């Protein structure tokens, strides 16, 4: 008989706010056998991540309260275990890959130090032996030139590369159970396939159980033995994968299986004036070596990109992780140094200093890929959204700022009554709406959207896309939309640029590029999507 590795029994979890407790997980029961993959799917805010984080008691208490039920690992309770017992389980026997990479990676340390720490603590390895293991694991998860990247800091990696490092960090301990919370979210389809194959191989080698949380149903089809569907904190359907996909019984499961980004970009305003003109943009990061960290070379990550973006238009930047998409966005924001010409609404930006840029900043806003990193956990939603107003409109009173926050929360589909809550109390999709509200409140002309829907399930993704389209039409916003999801790009973008290793592979109207791609790499991306 197969041994039950993990059993979640009638679990209910709540968040306390003053005198009230809001139940976010309600009477959930799941079990995972050794060598089995259970996929946990459901929309943002359904309780998937709270359920997963409860397994290792990683949620802060207070405000979290475990209202009823238990979680058992190999028959032993984890909810009622001592801190010492939990320390022996965390990382060693149960490893976790988090949804937001920067939660797991220390921004102050190079990758080698962080990965070595895992092997030193959990497997007692010495540095030389550990280095070989680290390089092998980084290579297996698809980090190019792994030996050269060991001295990089997390901020020098793309979002997808950070997720791959995080996966490597979890797998180095060779755990009995792996909890994977959206582990392939930021990865392009080709690397996603590599990661799934790697997880399958390691599962076979270690007889490892896996709780795989995702909104990507195509991954669930390829990887999961069984599937549990969550809605509003409850498990509404649970079955083996083949049966659930062939004949789902619950209406919500049927809705999930039928959801996919669709529709066309909003009509362009006529006439549409040029808002952003970029010529020969290039970004290079210095390579430093030696005790004195002297610059010995440069790593060119964006190579001579040129494009124009009109008011009310969306330009999609697509390509695999590490192709230079996010770096291009940071260069346009003047958050990193670059060469070339950036002209915004007739004003050259390249030679402006910080003081000269300030009057323009409110007109170019950004929504980052990772809302958990971009939202200050110590500020409540009101403080987060009004922060830009304090800088750019300092004469507004507190009451005026609050009224603007309430209005913009309505506009992005958030309940203004939640404005005194903190980011940790919101789901990933709700946090992304907060980030959009923070950008929108300054009435920008251009918003740079860096994978804004990549961490969201399909139903919430569709809601965010509808929101972005409606905001674009209402305010004549221009979007630079950075994504690896070609379905989303097709539904939102007028123009598209395909990047590979910092270079433009193909560029043109979205409809033409999707219908008749000229380059083999573009055809490969479309075939895998």
Q: What spans do the regions from the language model cover?
A:
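A short, proline-enriched helix->beta-strand linker immediately N-terminal to the Walker B motif
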Residues: 172-176, 441-445
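ABC ATPase NBD coupling module
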Residues: 64, 78-95, 121, 242-248, ...
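Conserved ABC transporter NBD signature motif
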Residues: 66-77, 340-349, 360
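A short, surface-exposed alpha-helical micro-motif characterized by mixed small hydrophobic
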Residues: 220-222, 489-491
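Conserved ABC ATPase signature
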Residues: 152-157, 161, 422-426, 430
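Conserved ABC ATPase "signature" region
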Residues: 129-148, 399-417
